[in-house]
Amino acid sequence: MEDFVRQCFNPMVVELAEKAMKEYGEDLKIETNKFAAICTHLEVCFMYSDFHFINEQGESIVVELDDPNALLKHRFEIIEGRDRTMAWTVVNSICNTTGAEKPKFLPDLYDYKENRFIEIGVTRREVHIYYLEKANKIKSENTHIHIFSFTGEEMATKADYTLDEESRARIKTRLFTIRQEMANRGLWDSFVSPKEAKKQLKKDLKSQELCAGLPTKVSRRTSPALRILEPMWMDSNRTAALRASFLKCPKK
């Protein structure tokens, strides 16, 4: 599973997931399913934000090409992926600026058009079950919940899906592709079932022992557009949208 994650996700997404797991004292070598889940969630958050701006008239627009003459503001502030201290700093700043109620738990995004925090969920189970779990945990009407599944289903607070159909279709297609690629490698069942995951982990560890002496080569390919991710990610005054040119999973 770890090899799959490193091949199928952009290196910056992988790096952020590694930092998140390290912050919580989790070992990605052991909790490989969680590693894959975090990378998937991060990518969905980026894709949710991608290309969405607010123009001078305060209208939400979708722009896929940079126009240096356009005075545009990013519609979404990405909170997910930051360390906890920085994330809460961003949340507090948003609350002070907009008057929004401070959430009890760290949300994933803030929508400047609708003036609300958003909690993104990606589930391997039934969307309505995961939605209810999120709602019961958050217990706040001020945080909007949007759940996606790997089967193309989705569920959102008051059936308000925030994004246009095309933007949501991009996310659903990516999730379906991840599922298919996992299935092709025999990883999907273990990703869904904890029991299967334990069997897969034992199998992977045994395989690593057998291959310990073999030379390895790691791909470091990064699309040119994604090289702007790190400075854009850390800079609240981002100047360009994160492009949706995520690395495609190489065929085995």
UniProtKB/Swiss-Prot annotation:
Site keyed Important for efficient shutoff activity and nuclear localization: positions: 195, 198-199
Coiled coil: none
One annotated GO biological process: viral translational frameshifting
Site location (Important for efficient shutoff activity): 28, 65, 202-203, 206
GO molecular function, one term: RNA binding
Gene3D superfamilies linked: Influenza RNA-dependent RNA polymerase subunit PA, endonuclease domain
Localization: Host cytoplasm; Host nucleus
InterPro entries: PA/PA-X, PA/PA-X_sf
One Pfam family cited in the UniProt record for this chain: Flu_PA
Residues forming the catalytic site: 80, 108
Superkingdom in the source lineage: Viruses
Keyword Repeat: no
Keywords associated with the record: Decay of host mRNAs by virus, Eukaryotic host gene expression shutoff by virus, Host cytoplasm, Host gene expression shutoff by virus, Host mRNA suppression by virus, Host nucleus, Host-virus interaction
Domain notes: The probable endonuclease active site in the N-terminus and the basic amino acid cluster in the C-terminus are important for the shutoff activity. The C-terminus acts as a nuclear localization signal. The C-terminus is recruited to host protein complexes involved in nuclear Pol II RNA processing.
Protein family according to the UniProt entry: Belongs to the influenza viruses PA-X family.
Role summary: Plays a major role in the shutoff of the host protein expression by cleaving mRNAs probably via an endonuclease activity. This host shutoff allows the virus to escape from the host antiviral response. Hijacks host RNA splicing machinery to selectively target host RNAs containing introns for destruction. This may explain the preferential degradation of RNAs that have undergone co- or post-transcriptional processing.
Name listed for the protein in its UniProt record: Protein PA-X
Name of encoding gene: PA
